[in-house]
C-alpha cells in the first residue's frame, strides 16, 4: 500500500499532466499560471525530500542532465522518406490519377493536413512512457535529441494509455512566441533568428537541454509509424488515437475526391495568415492504410502522399531608400530599405534589387509602393512596383560613379550586369567581406570569429587581411568588447585549429572570383598543393572538367596579384597547411556521389552557379537535360520544359526547400 507521501506525489503528477494537457494541447487552461506553479513547486519539494520516488516521466524531469558532447545517431525503424511536391492543380490531379491507375479501385478517400514549417521529430513510447525523441536526419539515420524533446511542454512524457507506439510530428514555434523570442535576443545584443523554422531547428539541436527549455517550442503529432495495439485501419483513425493518447494533433479534413482536395488547398493559401503558426503548404495522404501498403514507395518518396507547396507570399510596402553594399569581389549591390512588413513569419525591412539592370527593368524608385516576397532564409526581393500609387514625389535612383566604400573607380565588365570596384587591395569593404568569407563555415570554419569581432580587429588595426588572424594573441582579444578571457581563448584555439583544414577549403577561403567549393574540390584532384596550383597555366586549367576560360582566367589573375601572393606567404609562415595530406585521406563528405541533378526555373536562395557548385562540392553531377538517368530535378520559379519532362519520366522533383534539406542532411551526416 502506498504511503501518504507516495500518494500525494502520484496525485500531483496526475494533476500537473492534466493541466499541461489543458494548457499546451487544448489551449483551454482551467487554472491560473500561479496555481500551476504552486503544484509544480510542491512536487519539486516532495521529490527533493524523497529522491527515491522520482521517476523519469515525472513533470519535474522535463529539464535535466548535463550538456552533451554530441548527439548519438539513431536508425529509424521505418525510413522517413521525403514527400513528392505539387505546385499547382494539375500536379494534384496527376497525383490522384496515378493512384487510381495503380490501385484500379472505384473510390479513394484523401486526408488533407497543414504542412507545418518546423522540424520533423520521431517519438518512441514504451508502456506509455517516452523513451526516445529523434530528428529526421537523412531519413534513415537521425540524431537522439530526447533530452531536448522532453523540454517541450506539449510532448507527453506519459501517455493516457500504457501503449507501445512510435509517433511522428513537427517541432515548431508559434508566431507570437517567435516575436517575443527575437525581442529577448535583441535586448541581449544577440542576433535574431531569421524565421520560426530556423529557431525551432536550432533549439532542438542544442547540446545543453537547458537552452532548449528556454525556447518556446511546441509539438504537433501527424502520424503513427508503429503501434502495438488493435489494428489501425485509416489515417483518420491514427490521428484520433493520437488525440486520445494526449497529443496535440494536426488539423485535417477527409475528402471524397481530388476536386475537394484542390479547393481546400486553394482556400488555405489565403487563410494561412489566420493560423498561430507558419505553414508552407498542405499534405495530401491516402486515408486507408491498406491501400497505402498496396501503393508502397519509390526509393525517395511514398506513392500515397504528396506535398502541395504554396506560392511565395507577397506583401505591399514602401521603398524608403536605396543603399549600396560592396561585396568581397567588389560587386556593388543595390538594396531597398523598406517600411517594415511581416512576410512569411518574419519582419522584412530590406529587399535585394540585384543590380542596375533590374532597377531599370522594374523601374523601382525611392518612395514607390512595391510588392515584396521572400522564400526560405534569403533576403527578400522586390517583385514589382505598384505604379498606380505614384504621386510624383518618387525619386529615380542612379548607381554611384565611384565606390561608396573607398571612392575608387567602378567599372561594368562586358557581359556582366554588376558594377565593380576595381580597388581590390585597398577597398575596406572588400577586405572586410573577404575576411568574413575566409572564416565562414564552408571555408576555414573558424567558430567564434564573426562580424562583430572582425569589425573591432580592423578598426583597431590588429589585422589588415585574413592571414593576420593567425598572428593574433589572446592578449590582443581580451580588451575587446564582449570578449573576456574565455571567449578570447576559444577564438585563438579555433584559429589555431583551422590551420589543418583540407586544401580545397583553403582554396575556397582565398576568395578567388568564380571559384566556389565545388570548383575548389575539383582543382585539388589535379593540384596537390597550393604552390602547384599557383604555377598552373591557363591551358592546363581549361583542360579540367568544370573549369572554363572564365574560371581559369580568374585563377591566373588572382595569383598574379603581388598582394595575394604576399598574403599566401603569410599563411604559409603561420603554419597553415597548403597541401594535401601525404596519405591522401582528406575530409570527404561526398554524400551526392553518383547523383545527377538538373536545375530549372529561378531559385531564391542561390544563383544557378552557387546551386551547381554545392552539388559538385558534394560529389554530384549537374547536367543540362533531363533523362531517365537523372536523379533529381530542382524546380524554382517559372520552371521550363525540363519540369514537364521530369514529371513525364517520373524523375524526383525537388522544390528549393527540399533541395536545401538534401544539402543540410549531407552536412549533418558528414
Swiss-Prot record:
GO terms for cellular component: cytosol. The keyword Manganese applies. Its cofactor is Mg(2+); Mn(2+). Its EC number is 6.5.1.2. InterPro entries: BRCT_dom (IPR001357), BRCT_dom_sf (IPR036420), DisA/LigA_HHH (IPR041663), DNA_ligase (IPR001679), DNA_ligase_AS (IPR018239), DNA_ligase_CS (IPR033136), DNAligase_adenylation (IPR013839), DNAligase_N (IPR013840). Zn(2+) binds at residues 403, 406, 421, 427. DNA ligase that catalyzes the formation of phosphodiester linkages between 5'-phosphoryl and 3'-hydroxyl groups in double-stranded DNA using NAD as a coenzyme and as the energy source for the reaction. It is essential for DNA replication and repair of damaged DNA. This is DNA ligase. The gene is ligA.
Amino acid at each position: 500500500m502506498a504511503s501518504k507521501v507516495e500518494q500525494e506525489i502520484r496525485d500531483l503528477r496526475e494533476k500537473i499532466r492534466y493541466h499541461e494537457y489543458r494548457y499546451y494541447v487544448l489551449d483551454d487552461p482551467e487554472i491560473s499560471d500561479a496555481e500551476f506553479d504552486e503544484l509544480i513547486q510542491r512536487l519539486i519539494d516532495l521529490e527533493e525530500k524523497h529522491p527515491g520516488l522520482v521517476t523519469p516521466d515525472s513533470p519535474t524531469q522535463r529539464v535535466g542532465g548535463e550538456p552533451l558532447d554530441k548527439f548519438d545517431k539513431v536508425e529509424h525503424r521505418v525510413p522517413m522518406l521525403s514527400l513528392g511536391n505539387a505546385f499547382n492543380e494539375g500536379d494534384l490531379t496527376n497525383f490522384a490519377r496515378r493512384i487510381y491507375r495503380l490501385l484500379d479501385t472505384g473510390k479513394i478517400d484523401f486526408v488533407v493536413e497543414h504542412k507545418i514549417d518546423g522540424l520533423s521529430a520521431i517519438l518512441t513510447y514504451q508502456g506509455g512512457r517516452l523513451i526516445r525523441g529523434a530528428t529526421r536526419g537523412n531519413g534513415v539515420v537521425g540524431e537522439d535529441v530526447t533530452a531536448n524533446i522532453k523540454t517541450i511542454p506539449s510532448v507527453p512524457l506519459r501517455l493516457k494509455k500504457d501503449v507501445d507506439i512510435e509517433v511522428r510530428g513537427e517541432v515548431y514555434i508559434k508566431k507570437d512566441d517567435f516575436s517575443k523570442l527575437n525581442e529577448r535576443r535583441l535586448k541581449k545584443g544577440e542576433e535574431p533568428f531569421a524565421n520560426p523554422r530556423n529557431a525551432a531547428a536550432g533549439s532542438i539541436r542544442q547540446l545543453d537541454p537547458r537552452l532548449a527549455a528556454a525556447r518556446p517550442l511546441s509539438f504537433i503529432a501527424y502520424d503513427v509509424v508503429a503501434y502495438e495495439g488493435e489494428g489501425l485501419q485509416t489515417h483518420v483513425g491514427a490521428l484520433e488515437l493520437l488525440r486520445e493518447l494526449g497529443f496535440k494533433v494536426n488539423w485535417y479534413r477527409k475528402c471524397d475526391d481530388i476536386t475537394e482536395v484542390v479547393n481546400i488547398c486553394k482556400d488555405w493559401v489565403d487563410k494561412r495568415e489566420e493560423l498561430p503558426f507558419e505553414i508552407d503548404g498542405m499534405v495530401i495522404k491516402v486515408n486507408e492504410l491498406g491501400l497505402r501498403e498496396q501503393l508502397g514507395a519509390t526509393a525517395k518518396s511514398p506513392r500515397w502522399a504528396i506535398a502541395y507547396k504554396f506560392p511565395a507570399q507577397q506583401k505591399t510596402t514602401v521603398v524608403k531608400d536605396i543603399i549600396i553594399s560592396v561585396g568581397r569581389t567588389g560587386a556593388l549591390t543595390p538594396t531597398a530599405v523598406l517600411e517594415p512588413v511581416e512576410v512569411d513569419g518574419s519582419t522584412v525591412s530590406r529587399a535585394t534589387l540585384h543590380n542596375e539592370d533590374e532597377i531599370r527593368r522594374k523601374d523601382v524608385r525611392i518612395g514607390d509602393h512595391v510588392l515584396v516576397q521572400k522564400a526560405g532564409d534569403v533576403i527578400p526581393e522586390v517583385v514589382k512596383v505598384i505604379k498606380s500609387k505614384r504621386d510624383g514625389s518618387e525619386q529615380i535612383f542612379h548607381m554611384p560613379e565611384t565606390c561608396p566604400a573607398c571612392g575608387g573607380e567602378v567599372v561594368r565588365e562586358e557581359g556582366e550586369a554588376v558594377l565593380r570596384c576595381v580597388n581590390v587591395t585597398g577597398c575596406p569593404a572588400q577586405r572586410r567581406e573577404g575576411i568574413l568569407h575566409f572564416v565562414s563555415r564552408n571555408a576555414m570554419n573558424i567558430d567564434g570569429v564573426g562580424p562583430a569581432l572582425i569589425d573591432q580587429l580592423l578598426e583597431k588595426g590588429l589585422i589588415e587581411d585574413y592571414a593576420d588572424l593567425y598572428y593574433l594573441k589572446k592578449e590582443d582579444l581580451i580588451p575587446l568588447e564582449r570578449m573576456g578571457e574565455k571567449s578570447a581563448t576559444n577564438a585563438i584555439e579555433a584559429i589555431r585549429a583551422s590551420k589543418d583544414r583540407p586544401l580545397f577549403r583553403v582554396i575556397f577561403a582565398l576568395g578567388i572570383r568564380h571559384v566556389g567549393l565545388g570548383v575548389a574540390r575539383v582543382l585539388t584532384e589535379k593540384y596537390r598543393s597550393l604552390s602547384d596550383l599557383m604555377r598552373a597555366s591557363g591551358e592546363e586549367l581549361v583542360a579540367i572538367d568544370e573549369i572554363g576560360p572564365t574560371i581559369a582566367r580568374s585563377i591566373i589573375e588572382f595569383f598574379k596579384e603581388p598582394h595575394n601572393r604576399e598574403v599566401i606567404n603569410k599563411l604559409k609562415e603561420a603554419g597553415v597547411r597548403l597541401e594535401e595530406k601525404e596519405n591522401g585521406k582528406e575530409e570527404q563528405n561526398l554524400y551526392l556521389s553518383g547523383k545527377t541533378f538538373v536545375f530549372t526555373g529561378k531559385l531564391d536562395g542561390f544563383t544557378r552557379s552557387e546551386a551547381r557548385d554545392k552539388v559538385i562540392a558534394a560529389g554530384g553531377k549537374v547536367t543540362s537535360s533531363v533523362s531517365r538517368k537523372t536523379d533529381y530535378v530542382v524546380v524554382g520559379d517559372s520552371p521550363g520544359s525540363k519540369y514537364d519532362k521530369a514529371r513525364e519520366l517520373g524523375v524526383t522533383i525537388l522544390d528549393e526547400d527540399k533541395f536545401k534539406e538534401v544539402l543540410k542532411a549531407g552536412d549533418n551526416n558528414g
